[in-house]
């Protein structure tokens, strides 16, 4: 994407639109409800937030920077609230161009198992970020998704191994006795992965 096209697209995107694109880059797949909970929190009611998020996502879809998967949560009758969103190649190129990066990704319709697992991971991630926003004395200092949260370590024989959790989270809990900071690697298990794959992670 050349600079002129990127600039023209940027002129049509609000700060919240940009944040939605960055969320989709970070989390890979998000439902309309996830994005509503993350970015449409300043509305008078949940219904108003739902309508605003649906309008914004349809506008971003019309601009060609996001796409709804063919698969929906809860079936077609649930309407736009059931949509699962991802960046398009255009959306990814726009973000990459805005940072001056050359790397490219391919965007394909993911399989059902990947979608289910990714949405489960993101349910937890969004819940933690909501708790950070609403719960007094609790904060999320860092939340890393794959592959940014992967860690390299040495095995028993000195060989290089990798830890590949779904999420890495650092939280802080304040309390009368000073509170504490907790570091956690989180793995979401839906009972669909074989044991050797889990052990390999």
Task: Give the role of each language-model region.
Residues 52, 116-120, 197-200:
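Soluble or luminal CAZymes and related metallo-dependent hydrolases
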Residues 6, 71, 135-184, 190-194, ...:
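Active-site metal-binding core of divalent-cation-utilizing nuclease and nuclease-like domains
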Residues 15, 79-80, 119, 162-164, ...:
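A generic fold-level signal
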Residues 93-143, 181:
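Amphipathic alpha-helical dimerization/coiled-coil segments
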Residues 1-108:
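Nuclease-adjacent, charged terminal/linker segments that flank catalytic cores
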């Amino acid at each position: 994407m050349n600079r002129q096209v990127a600039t023209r697209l940027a002129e049509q995107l609000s700060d919240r639109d940009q944040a939605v694109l960055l969320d989709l880059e970070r989390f890979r797949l998000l439902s309309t409800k996830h994005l509503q909970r993350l970015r449409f929190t300043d509305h008078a009611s949940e219904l108003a937030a739902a309508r605003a998020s649906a309008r914004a996502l349809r506008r971003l879809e019309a601009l060609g920077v996001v796409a709804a998967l063919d698969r929906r949560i809860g079936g077609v009758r649930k309407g736009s609230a059931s949509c699962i969103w991802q960046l398009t190649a255009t959306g990814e190129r726009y973000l990459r161009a805005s940072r001056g990066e050359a790397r490219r990704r391919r965007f394909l319709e993911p399989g059902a198992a990947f979608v289910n697992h990714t949405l489960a991971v993101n349910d937890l991630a969004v819940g933690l970020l909501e708790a950070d926003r609403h719960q007094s004395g609790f904060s999320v200092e860092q939340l890393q998704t794959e592959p940014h949260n992967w860690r390299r370590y040495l095995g028993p024989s000195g060989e290089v191994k990798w830890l590949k959790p779904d999420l890495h989270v650092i939280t802080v809990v304040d309390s009368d006795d000073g509170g504490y900071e907790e570091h956690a690697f989180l793995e979401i298990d839906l009972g669909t992965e074989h044991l050797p794959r889990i052990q390999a992670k």
